């Protein structure tokens, strides 16, 4: 499937690698032509509305303020590797600021997701891997008439995410705290038009969830 066909598909399922690929592709189009020589109205609009990062929405300020607060928090947190629903649960200790640096999507990537949801007016969004909820907040604010269902396997991380939802006063988000392999089969009856994979990053798990949901 070409990237244009993918962007036109009614259901979009992507991970951070694909977000980078889309961004690179649109930048390439802009560099080799310039946006005024692009004949496809859709591609022109995508470059104008998705790639153009000069427009900063008011919701970005609140989300990035929460990020800045998280980056200052040095409290330890015990993490459990529950993403794939593994029976052999691995535990590790980190801190909230390190978790924010390592697991959260960078602002520029999360803002591309925001612009995609806003541009295509997606209304039923599924996020696999809530983490600290910053990317979720971007998805939520992109279309406040829509609904974001987000899954987080780790109970302590899920608790932190819920606090951030409350801080940002997000009303259109449903947070589910369950291992992915347990909950995703229960969600198959729902019709999602935008799916973001940002949880278990193993190839096998990602492909399994992709084929289940798409």
Describe these PLM feature segments:
Residues 2-194, 200-214:
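A short alpha-helical cap/connector motif
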């Amino acid at each position: 499937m070409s990237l244009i066909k993918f962007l036109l598909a009614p259901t979009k399922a992507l991970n951070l690698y694909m977000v980078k690929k889309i961004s690179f592709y649109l930048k390439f189009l802009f560099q080799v032509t310039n946006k005024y020589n692009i004949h496809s109205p859709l591609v022109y609009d995508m470059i104008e509305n998705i790639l153009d990062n000069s427009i900063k929405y008011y919701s970005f300020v609140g989300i990035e303020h929460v990020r800045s607060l998280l980056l200052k928090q040095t409290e330890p947190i015990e993490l459990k590797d529950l993403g794939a629903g593994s029976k052999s649960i691995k535990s590790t200790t980190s801190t909230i600021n390190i978790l924010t640096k390592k697991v959260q999507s960078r602002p520029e990537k999360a803002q591309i997701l925001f612009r995609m949801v806003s541009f295509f007016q997606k209304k039923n969004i599924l996020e696999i891997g809530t983490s600290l909820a910053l990317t979720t907040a971007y998805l939520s604010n992109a279309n406040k008439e829509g609904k974001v269902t987000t899954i987080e396997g780790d109970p302590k991380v899920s608790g932190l995410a819920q606090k951030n939802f409350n801080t940002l006063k997000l009303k259109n988000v449903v947070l589910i705290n369950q291992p992915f392999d347990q909950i995703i089969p229960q969600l198959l009856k729902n019709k999602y038009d935008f799916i973001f994979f940002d949880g278990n990053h193993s190839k096998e798990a990602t492909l399994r969830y992709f084929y289940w949901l798409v």
